Design a protein with these regions (language model features):
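Conserved C-terminal "lid"/linker of ANL adenylate-forming enzymes
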Residues: 105-110, 118-119, 138-205
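Conserved ATP-binding/catalytic segment of the ANL
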Residues: 11-16, 22-88, 97, 113, ...
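Adenylate-forming
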Residues: 68-96, 120-129, 144-153
Length: 205
């Protein structure tokens, strides 16, 4: 297996630089086809469309000086406020260090030709999302990342949608925020949770 981190143009990046996780040589555990995909089109689109001839795994990562990898989130869920790419895991890591926060989900919302960062939090029972708690979350994120990571809007939700394997579904929530149809609802363990993100008045201005 030959693992490399590449930018959007396919150039190999050095340690500490964030980009797409790719493999340029085959490896024993890679799938060779998808079920019900006789032409192989879905398989090719999933892994080989972005960089022809290279396996693109779909993770936004950086290589360490020792050859390890830090994963910042799925590359298709990377935020892009002001043209700066931000991995969602960088925000989760800080937001969920706040005692009152059980879990969180962050998406980018298109607004006025740019992307604003919107953070949803599920709080411990009996905790209200006050302005003081919002400030505490923002301060924690700003202190340990960059000002670009700080969410413009923070909202609370009673539940966060996830797949049947337990992964949160940022893209589905992002589509809800933009009024788009949701694909593969039957893949979600709790599709009703999407209703908590729909038609939020705080997101219309």
């Amino acid at each position: 297996m030959k693992v490399e981190v590449r930018d959007d143009q396919g150039n190999v990046l050095g340690p500490g630089e964030k980009g797409e996780l790719t493999c340029s040589k085959s490896f024993p555990s890679m799938p060779i086809r998808f079920w019900n995909d006789p032409t192989g089109d879905k398989y090719h689109a999933a892994y080989f469309d972005k960089f022809p001839g290279l396996w693109c795994h779909g993770d936004y990562v950086a290589e360490t000086d020792h050859g390890g990898l830090v994963i910042y989130g799925r590359s298709d869920a990377v935020l892009n406020p002001g043209g700066v790419r931000i991995g969602t895991a960088e925000i989760y890591r800080e937001a969920e260090q706040v005692d009152e926060v059980i879990e969180s989900l962050v998406v980018g919302q298109q607004r006025a030709g740019d992307v604003r960062v919107v953070l949803f939090v599920r709080l411990r029972e009996g905790i209200a999302l006050t302005d003081d708690l919002r400030d505490q979350i923002r301060k924690r994120i700003r202190s340990n990342t960059t000002p670009r990571h700080v969410p413009e809007i923070i909202l609370d939700v009673p539940d966060i949608p996830r797949t049947k394997s337990g992964k949160i579904v940022e893209l589905a929530v992002q589509r809800v925020l933009h009024g788009e149809a949701i694909k593969n609802l039957n893949a979600l363990a709790n599709p009703e949770a999407l209703d908590y993100f729909r038609d939020r008045p705080e997101l219309t201005s």
